[in-house]
Each structure stands twice: as C-alpha cells, then as structure tokens.
C-alpha cells in the first residue's frame, strides 16, 4: 500500500518516512512499494552556499552531507528509517530498535557502507550513503559536493572489487521515490539477464543508443527492453558512457529531467556495464525511465536479478 504524501511548501516532493518495525533489508524482499509521492514544483538545484553548515558525515569523510536547507527533501540525521538505522549501527555501533536486527556491515568507508540485499545471495547487495539522503529526489545529489556513489558501487561490484557481484552480467540500479520501500538512498548492486545485455548491444549496433549527453532525452534513443519472464517490456532512455567519472544524478537532471519538465522523484536509473566473453568491455549503458514514457517504469526491479 502506498502511504499518502504530506503536502508542504517545499521545492520538491515531501516524503512520508517509514517506521522501522522490521529489519531494513527484510523490507526490500518482495513487498510492494510502501512510500507515496506527489508531483511538486521546480526543485532548487543551486550549489550549496559556501557559508552553509552541512551535517558532517558519520566517519568524517571527505564528502559533505546535505546542508540544513535540504533536509525537508533529503531527510534529517535524527530520522529513524530502518536502512538509516543500519547505517548508524555500522558507523557508530548504535543498535537498531527492536525488533529490527543488526545488519551485517560488509564494507564501510567514509562515504558509504555496503550491506546484503534481500534475499541474501552472492549477487544482491546495497550501497548506502553514510550521509542522510532519502533518495533520488534529494537535490544535493546533483551538486559537486556529493560523493560519486555510482562509481563507488561499480568499483565494489566489479570482478576484483571489495564486494563483487558474482553473476555473468552486472546491473546497478536505484528506484524512484514512488517505487522504493525504504527512505534512505541505496543503489542496488545485482545481476542482469543475458537477454538484457544482448538487447543493449543490439541497440548499440543499430545506433539506437545515445552517445552524446545532449541526445539522452531524445525519443529516438528510447527503447523497449524485456525484463523478468512474464513482466513484459518497459521503455528506457538509453545512453552509453565510457566511464562513470561524472555524477549520473547531475546528468539525469540536466539532460533528461529538466529539459522535459519532469520530476526527479519519479525517475529510475540503471547502469549496465558492457560485457563480452572476455569480460568488461570498458563502457557503460545508462538507462533512465519514468511513468511519463509510454510503457515506462519507475523501478529498476524489472531488469535487475536479485535471486
């Protein structure tokens, strides 16, 4: 069931926080979306003022956290979302309130932690910021101060990474505010089906993948891609990048969301490293979608493989 959203005078969607009645990872296992969202006015996308006082990230890492003026959209450090409780345990040792269980902290850094997803497999992990950030709608993610969480996820998930995704093809993904179940940003590190990889490479051969950022939102680079058996096709905007050195949240807003007058809170974003029989081919397919597209989707779950 979707929670109703509370309307407030904020530049973007105001989320309704979930209460942590069970372990955070357990909430990610097979349930429908629990968080509701509403369309809102244009967000504030300016860089944080130099004299603002960002909340220091737990662990005092090099990347700042969202300043106080972003808290209505990005969350407060005092929030009790289950996944944020997991961060507090991994970083500070703060035990989650019962009946939530202690998480298994697979990796910790100044900017993020990595946890098991649910179900717990060798190709289902979550990268979670140590900053309090609700999700993709947080405008701070689009600023130069934010950590590059997508590249961090890839560096861990790749073969030889600290928490490698053991699956022939890897996918990284984030759900929209409409479709996620927990109100703390998390990037799924999982598998993708061979058919997804093959479809993307076929689209590339047909020149149906944007290779310039300015073309990412163009209808000619929208393509239907089949997900799980029986789930049907979904439409995605497909871009190819040589690396993940740029902030994907910034690129998504600048080249897709803002030009079309869309809502960042309704976007899903997926990264599929190009793979061949020899391994990683040195580039990435970046897919975006939302419910403004015909047969679009607000979730990455159609393409990612968790079980």
Name each model feature, range by range.
Residues 9, 31-61:
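C-terminal segment of N-terminal export signals and the immediately downstream linker at the start
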Residues 1-5, 41, 50, 174:
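Intrinsic-disorder/low-complexity regions
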Residues 47-307:
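HIT superfamily nucleotide-processing domains
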Residues 1-14, 18-32, 37:
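N-terminal secretory signal peptides
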């Amino acid at each position: 069931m979707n929670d109703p959203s509370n309307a407030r005078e904020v530049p973007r969607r105001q989320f309704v926080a979930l209460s942590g009645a069970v372990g955070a990872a357990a909430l990610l296992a097979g349930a429908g979306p629990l968080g509701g969202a509403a369309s809102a006015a244009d967000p504030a996308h300016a860089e944080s003022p130099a004299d603002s006082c960002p909340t220091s990230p737990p662990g005092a890492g090099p990347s700042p956290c969202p300043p106080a003026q972003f808290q209505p959209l990005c969350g407060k450090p005092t929030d009790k979302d289950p996944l944020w409780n997991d961060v507090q345990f991994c970083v500070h040792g703060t035990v989650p309130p019962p009946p939530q269980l202690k998480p298994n902290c697979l990796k910790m850094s100044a900017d993020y932690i990595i946890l098991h997803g649910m179900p717990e497999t060798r190709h289902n992990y979550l990268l979670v910021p140590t900053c309090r950030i609700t999700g993709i709608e947080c405008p701070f993610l689009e600023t130069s101060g934010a950590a590059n969480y997508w590249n961090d996820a890839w560096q861990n998930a790749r073969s030889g990474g600290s928490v490698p995704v053991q699956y022939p093809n890897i996918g990284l993904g984030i759900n929209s505010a409409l479709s996620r179940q927990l109100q703390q940003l998390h990037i799924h590190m999982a598998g993708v089906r061979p058919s997804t990889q093959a479809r993307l490479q076929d689209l590339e051969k047909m020149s149906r993948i944007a290779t310039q950022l300015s073309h990412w939102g163009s209808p000619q680079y929208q393509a239907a891609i089949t997900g799980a058996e029986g789930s049907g096709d979904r439409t995605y905007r497909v871009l190819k990048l040589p690396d993940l050195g740029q902030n994907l949240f910034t690129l998504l807003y600048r080249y897709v969301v803002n030009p079309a007058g869309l809502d960042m809170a309704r976007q899903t974003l997926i990264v599929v490293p190009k793979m061949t029989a020899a391994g990683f081919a040195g580039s990435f397919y970046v897919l975006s979608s939302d419910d403004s597209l015909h047969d679009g989707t607000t979730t990455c779950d159609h393409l990612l493989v968790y079980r």
